[in-house]
């Protein structure tokens, strides 16, 4: 929004700063961070008053989780509000990729909000039917994938970019749309499954968001793509504003979500942030790299899939409990130990993902 003020700039005033992407990215980060610090405590107090008993705790979960009873959920509202406000304030609103990612984030956030609301109201862990959430998510992802394909340059519209190879593209035809749908919905649900311990999901999301922000900046810069041998997608650099706001809002939330958490992210936050990561990957044509950068989320999701399929087939379990972070809890690992080690893994995977820009 503030970018429009550059029209009134003569090149020598403060409005000229708004032309620079890096300046606006930094401003978006601090705007979201300050927003989170200012409104975090009032929101938590409001949620505690409205929710009473807070988020229901699974009866079959680790015994240590019963001490968390009464903790309010829907903390993702803090991330979403700071993210949306900051992005609208600092991003160019004539950029289609900004709107695609922003609308996907809000739409999945609404799905998560409905699920959290149902859980709190019924005081059970069921919430909205998984099938209903999945179908609505597919519809949102289909619209986003189609919009992204429409916004891409003609030579990239239905292409899948391959990492580690210079300008390597695979033409998926119209299979690109269902593929992109799987990426967006899969990312949303994978982050949702990861959000099971205090601080576990938000830091890997911020790490992945930072990585995708760098990738978006590179992919949207012709000189950098020409040097690195990466496909050029004009306009994606503006997504750096979104990812900067995501990290700022995420840090503001982590201030209150750090163990012992004063508030849980809930599906409101996890589905929204996962959907955002998937949408950014689709817009930047880095869907495969997302699987590397978000390898922790992929592992969490696969642990659930493997557990369910193996149990249905044999009546036995591969893991003591799924998702896999609960398996380590059952083995006696302390919660902070699991969280920090998973953060380290996320950072390593992010560095590997970034290396794909150069290793070609």
Swiss-Prot record:
Protein name listed in UniProt: Phospho-N-acetylmuramoyl-pentapeptide-transferase
Keywords from the named record: Cell cycle, Cell division, Cell inner membrane, Cell membrane, Cell shape, Cell wall biogenesis/degradation, Magnesium, Membrane, Metal-binding, Peptidoglycan synthesis, Transferase, Transmembrane, Transmembrane helix
Species lineage: Bacteria, Pseudomonadati, Pseudomonadota, Alphaproteobacteria, Rhodobacterales
First-listed, main subcellular location of the protein, grouped into a coarse class: membrane
Transmembrane segments: 27-47, 71-91, 93-113, 134-154, 168-188, 199-219, 239-259, 262-282, 288-308, 337-357
Pfam families the UniProt entry points to: Glycos_transf_4, MraY_sig1
GO molecular function: metal ion binding; phospho-N-acetylmuramoyl-pentapeptide-transferase activity; UDP-N-acetylmuramoyl-L-alanyl-D-glutamyl-meso-2,6-diaminopimelyl-D-alanyl-D-alanine:undecaprenyl-phosphate transferase activity
Biological source species: Cereibacter sphaeroides (strain ATCC 17025 / ATH 2.4.3)
Main EC class the enzyme belongs to: transferase
